[in-house]
């Protein structure tokens, strides 16, 4: 994802947080040859510029103290190998903060995010002293959201126990070859919707 790469470089560079800086990185990361239609490329570039300008405006008010970006991790959870990548980890006076960037149009509550819960589970057990411990906050940052881009939640031990149970339950289902369909808006772009999905059988 180009936006994720731009933000990784942006927070890894030294100096003040500026609009010119982030747009220069966008230009360097943008790969024009990967788009089939020029009109589509222009529209996507326009949207990227708008999102990043707004991000800078929001971020420069209280620049984060970034500990790490694009952190690849893995750990074992009750015999299940969990692998993932955390977009950004900040340090604040009250503890660490996990941030996950979203470019989707639909905003969702952070407290319902299994993804953020997994990040918190990893940090709870990591031996890296600067990162260890349940994050003070875990945040979904919706880059398209003009009104409230940040949706945050503090995961408790009870929350994490529930997420652990959910993950192990899914793993048991996969091992038993049980794949119950779960219909929703994500079905709109699923190739199996009209082919072999029992949830959409007429």
Give names to the regions the model predicted.
Residues 68-127:
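Non-catalytic protein-protein interaction segments used by genome-maintenance enzymes to assemble
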Residues 5-11, 107-142:
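Metal-dependent nuclease catalytic cores in nucleic-acid-processing enzymes
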Residues 1-5, 17, 21, 43-50, ...:
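Generic recognition of stable, solvent-exposed alpha-helical segments in well-folded globular domains
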Residues 27-33, 95-99, 167-173:
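Short amphipathic alpha-helical segments and their helix-coil junctions
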Residues 2-72, 76:
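A non-catalytic, helix-rich entry segment at domain boundaries
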Residues 20-21, 124-202:
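Metal-dependent nuclease catalytic regions and adjoining charged, substrate-binding loops involved
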């Amino acid at each position: 994802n180009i936006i994720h790469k731009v933000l990784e470089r942006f927070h890894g560079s030294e100096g003040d947080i500026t609009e010119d800086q982030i747009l220069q990185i966008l230009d360097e990361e943008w790969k024009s040859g990967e788009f089939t239609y020029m009109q589509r490329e222009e529209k996507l570039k326009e949207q990227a510029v708008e999102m990043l300008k707004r991000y800078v405006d929001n971020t420069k008010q209280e620049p984060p103290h970034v500990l790490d970006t694009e952190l690849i991790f893995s750990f074992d959870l009750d015999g299940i190998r969990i692998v993932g990548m955390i977009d950004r980890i900040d340090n604040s006076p009250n503890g660490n903060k996990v941030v996950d960037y979203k470019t989707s149009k639909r905003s969702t509550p952070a407290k319902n995010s299994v993804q953020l819960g997994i990040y918190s589970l990893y940090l709870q057990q990591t031996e890296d002293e600067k990162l260890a411990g349940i994050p003070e906050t875990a945040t979904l940052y919706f880059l398209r959201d003009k009104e409230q881009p940040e949706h945050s939640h503090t995961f408790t031990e009870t929350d994490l126990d529930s997420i652990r149970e959910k993950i192990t339950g899914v793993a048991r289902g996969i091992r038993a070859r049980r794949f119950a369909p779960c219909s929703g808006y994500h079905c709109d772009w699923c190739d199996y919707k009209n082919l072999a999905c029992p949830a959409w059988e007429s």
